[in-house]
Every structure is written in C-alpha cells, then in structure tokens.
Regions:
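Short beta-strand elements in bilobed, periplasmic/extracellular small-molecule ligand-binding domains
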Residues: 1-2, 96-101, 116-134
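Hinge/cleft segment of the Venus flytrap/periplasmic-binding protein
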Residues: 99-102, 107, 119, 188, ...
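Hydrophobic alpha-helical segments within soluble ligand-binding/sensing domains
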Residues: 9, 66-94, 140-141, 165, ...
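Early extracytoplasmic/lumenal segment of secretory-pathway proteins
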Residues: 1-19
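Flexible loop/hinge segments that line or gate small-molecule binding clefts
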Residues: 31, 36-74, 189-198, 202
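Hydrophobic alpha-helical
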Residues: 13-18, 22-43, 115, 133-194
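Short, solvent-exposed amphipathic alpha-helices that sit
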Residues: 75-82, 106-126, 143, 167-171, ...
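Short beta-strand segments enriched in small/hydrophobic residues
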Residues: 23, 28, 65-67, 95-104
Length: 247
C-alpha cells in the first residue's frame, strides 16, 4: 500500500519489475505523477492492470493493459439522486453543498459532474458553494471543519472519495453539526458502513464493490497474462448505492 505516496509507489513497482513478475495490479496514486512508474513497468515487458484510479488517458492507451473502473459519471448521478431525495424529503429547496474532492484524478471530476447534473435537475435551487481537495483523511477533516465554519448555513457535504467522506463526517461531528449537516459519500469502508448505519450524519454512499472489483481484476489479469484479452482497455465494474448498511 503506497498510502498516497508517489515515491513509495515507485519503489514498490521497481521492486516488482526487478523480480520480473507476470503482471502488476495497482490503483495509481496520481494521474500524472504515477505515469513514469507505470511506463517503466510497461517498457520492462510487465503488463500493468489499473483499478479504480489510473494514469492519464494517453498513458493508459500506451502503457496500461487494462483499467477497471465504475463509470464515474453514473457513480455521481446515483449519489446526486440520493442527495435530491434527502433534500426533497426535508423540504430544503435551496440547499448549500460543499465538496471535498480528489480531483487530481479525472474520475473524481466526473463523479462531481454526475452528482451536480442530477441534483440540480431535481432540486434547481441547489448550490455548490465550495469545492476543495481533501483526499487523505486528516486533510479532509481539516478542510471540512473550515468549510463548516466559513459557511454557517451549509446543508451538506459531498465526499468524492472514502477519505473525503469519512473526513466530512468527522468534521461535522467535531463542529457539533450532527443532525444539521448531511454527508453524501463515496467508497465503502468498515468505518463508513458504521456511520451509515448510525445515519445521523452520513445519509448515502455510492461504492464499487470490492469483491466485484477484485473478481473482475483477477479475471482480467489472467486474460492479459495468457494473452486472451479482447483489446478493450477500460472495463466497467458495477456500481451500488447504499442508504443504510442492510441495502
């Protein structure tokens, strides 16, 4: 686990290249920053399979054997629908929403665009009042707290990633806004599932099932190694919406 560190990712991949492994599976740390690392592996003759995040499209076309991802626009639309349901049910016709983002990756930009498109079509008065980076948990908490303090009438926060989602929830709790500010998030973890079960702050999460993704990545990696891949590089994996953990 590179833990968001490009240098760690580079070291890990170089170690695998030196071992002459059959394939490398990774979720890229940075769309642009990880490009050289992926290129080195590819030029060493080792196929690279990305999941969830990858390098830029030009790099995918040239150096990546497969990229498995849930359609990010559809991902955002599902979350936007859930947010619209919440605002309509609570008779909030002009909600103010802040975004904590991971927009170093194009997939996160598309998640937000899908979210905004559906939300604003169903709740025309909705406003995105802020959009700040906070992919890593600690930063997401700090960003979330500052957004809450600077926007006293904030109604909700959208988290574009797991770290952003959990950070938003913790920021709401830290600022004693539970029950006043809702969070709509992305990417399920055990702690996020617990917050969804509690339902006081976190109202909905969209996720690409880890099990489904793992199975799809494993199957595609075997196809690549055995030279049975059909040439399709970007492979869509199913997306799920959760409004409570038993969904």
């Amino acid at each position: 686990n590179a833990q968001g560190d490009i240098s760690k990712e580079s070291t890990f991949v170089d170690t695998l290249v030196a071992r002459n492994v059959d394939a490398i599976i990774l979720s890229a740390v940075s769309e642009n920053g990880s490009s050289r690392t992926v290129r080195r592996a590819s030029e060493a003759g080792i196929p690279v399979i990305c999941y969830n995040t990858c390098i830029n499209q030009k790099g995918v076309d040239k150096y990546v054997s497969a990229y498995l991802v849930g359609d990010p626009l559809e991902f955002g639309k599902k979350l936007g629908n859930a947010a619209a349901d919440y605002f309509i049910a609570n008779k909030i016709d002009q909600p103010k929403i802040a975004v904590i983002n991971c927009e170093a990756f194009e997939v996160c930009v598309q998640r937000r665009k899908g979210f905004e498109e559906v939300l604003k079509s169903r709740v025309p008065g909705a406003q995105i009042v802020a959009n700040q980076e906070g992919t890593v948990l600690d930063k997401a908490i700090s960003v979330g707290e500052k957004l809450i303090i600077s926007t006293p009438d904030l109604n909700a926060i959208m988290g574009e990633s797991g770290g952003a989602t959990l950070g938003a929830v913790k920021a709401v709790r830290n600022q004693n806004q539970a029950g006043k500010i809702a969070v709509f998030g992305s990417d399920m973890t055990t702690e996020i599932a617990q917050e969804l079960e509690n339902n006081q702050v976190l109202k909905a999460v969209v996720d690409i099932s880890g099990k489904k993704m793992g199975n799809a990545v494993f199957a595609q990696t075997l196809k690549v190694i055995n030279k049975q891949a059909d040439g399709e590089k970007v492979i869509q994996v199913p997306i799920d919406l959760y409004t409570k953990t038993e969904d």
